[in-house]
Amino acid sequence: MSEVTTAEFNEEGKYLRKIRSFVLREGRLTKGQAQAIESQWPTMGLDYSPTPLVLSDVFGREADTVLEIGFGMGASLVQMAKDAPEQNFIGIEVHKPGVGSCLSDAAIAGVTNLRVYHHDAMEVLEHAIADGSLARVQLFFPDPWHKKRHHKRRIVQAEFAELIRRKLKIGGVFHMATDWEEYSEHMLEVMQAAPGYKNQSSDGTVVPRPDHRPLTKFEARGHRLGHGVWDLMFERIA
């Protein structure tokens, strides 16, 4: 069991301090997850270091790089890497069984263009990712912290938007998705106010699910039950 921290922001989105977001219970690794970590980490795992990655060294080539924050069990991330072999993918996840599951699926799929961090995403972004190096940042279904008193814990805040903008190259895209409509409205408000971005939606709101984001089983079930999912895509223009 380990403590996971997140940032706290004031009402203007100014960073205040790190606070404990939740206590992560690692859960038991399945035999397959443990074996995948042991066998695949040397080739697909990235050990955190507070110095920026040289992506061409990590992947052995120059290519657009997509980074996903909090990939869960990793099925969608592996599918994206498989569907776009011309791109590089980096996933960050603090839940160890999710890391094991992702590595297992990646090995089975035979993908070679995926690397994984088991670390705090804010630290990785701040220190291990060079400014202007990413073609896309993905944040899919983050915790909505739906109670008003917990809104300060939401990851999409003004300073976070600025951090992502710095890491994107000009023309790069910050892609968010949520199944909580009120959080999508919060995301839209934050991103519309963030300098250096342009909303890719034709009507200035949300976009249809793009082809590059796979439809998850959870999401497909939600559609059948009439639940919505909202995608937002903002391009770095400055």
Swiss-Prot record:
Instruction: State the protein's name.
Output: tRNA (guanine-N(7)-)-methyltransferase
Its Enzyme Commission number(s) read 2.1.1.33
Record's GO cellular component terms? tRNA methyltransferase complex
Q: Please give the coiled-coil regions recorded for this protein.
A: none
> What gene is this protein translated from?
trmB
- Where do the catalytic residues lie? D143
Catalysed reaction equations from the record? guanosine(46) in tRNA + S-adenosyl-L-methionine = N(7)-methylguanosine(46) in tRNA + S-adenosyl-L-homocysteine
The alphabetized UniProt keywords are: Methyltransferase, S-adenosyl-L-methionine, Transferase, tRNA processing
Q: Which organism is it from?
A: Shewanella baltica (strain OS223)
Recorded GO MF terms: tRNA (guanine(46)-N7)-methyltransferase activity
Q: What class of enzyme is it?
A: transferase
Q: Which domain of life is it from?
A: Bacteria
Record-listed S-adenosyl-L-methionine binding positions: E68, E93, D120, D143
- For whether the record's keyword set contains Repeat, the answer is no
Q: What does this protein do?
A: Catalyzes the formation of N(7)-methylguanine at position 46 (m7G46) in tRNA.
Q: Where does substrate bind?
A: K147, D179, T216, K217, F218, E219
Q: Which InterPro entries match?
A: SAM-dependent_MTases_sf, tRNA_(Gua-N-7)_MeTrfase_Trmb, tRNA_methyltr_TrmB_bact
Pathway the protein takes part in: tRNA modification; N(7)-methylguanine-tRNA biosynthesis
PROSITE patterns attached to this UniProt entry? SAM_MT_TRMB
Matches recorded under Pfam families: Methyltransf_4
Q: Family assignment?
A: Belongs to the class I-like SAM-binding methyltransferase superfamily. TrmB family.
